[in-house]
């Protein structure tokens, strides 16, 4: 009887443990995020190209226009890899602009994004200028393939 109880307990532990595997990151879960959602913004930043150089970020949410400042260690190139698309090396300039496009597409109410790289001048983008240059930014986040486009179009 004890053996059956032990086997049943082990089996249930295994089944429950396997059903709690970490959820794969899904970009669609973050569409429509607001700049005030610190956790969601952090999750997005940790998936974008150059995330390995990310130091910290801050959000300006006290009054419009809402903005964010993202600080990176200095880098010259990084891998641009979104989902299962083939990774490609891109310059820091391309990575920052592509990241800004994706952030504007995912975060509804952010109007300005400022990137600070150690030892470099701040690089800033606003929603209006990138929309004029690239059109409807929300179309960029339709699927993983379209999310690679900002990094291909800029180089």
Predicted regions and their residues:
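Sec-dependent N-terminal signal peptides of Gram-positive bacterial secreted proteins and lipoproteins
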Residues: 2-21
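Intrinsic-disorder-associated interaction segments
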Residues: 23, 34-37, 89, 123, ...
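N-proximal, solvent-exposed amphipathic alpha-helical segments enriched in charged/polar residues
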Residues: 19-80
């Amino acid at each position: 009887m004890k053996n059956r109880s032990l086997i049943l307990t082990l089996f249930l532990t295994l089944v429950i443990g396997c059903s709690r595997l970490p959820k794969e990151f899904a970009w669609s879960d973050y569409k429509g995020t607001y700049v005030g959602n610190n956790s969601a913004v952090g999750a997005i930043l940790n998936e974008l190209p150059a995330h390995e150089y990310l130091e910290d970020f801050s959000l300006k949410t006290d009054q419009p226009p809402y903005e964010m400042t993202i600080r990176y260690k200095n880098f010259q190139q990084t891998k641009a890899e979104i989902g299962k698309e083939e990774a490609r090396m891109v310059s820091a300039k391309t990575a920052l602009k592509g990241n800004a496009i994706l952030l504007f597409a995912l975060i509804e109410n952010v109007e300005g994004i400022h990137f600070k790289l150690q030892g470099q001048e701040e690089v800033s983008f606003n929603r209006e200028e990138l929309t004029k240059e690239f059109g409807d930014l929300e179309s960029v986040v339709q699927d993983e393939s379209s999310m690679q486009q900002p990094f291909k179009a800029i180089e």
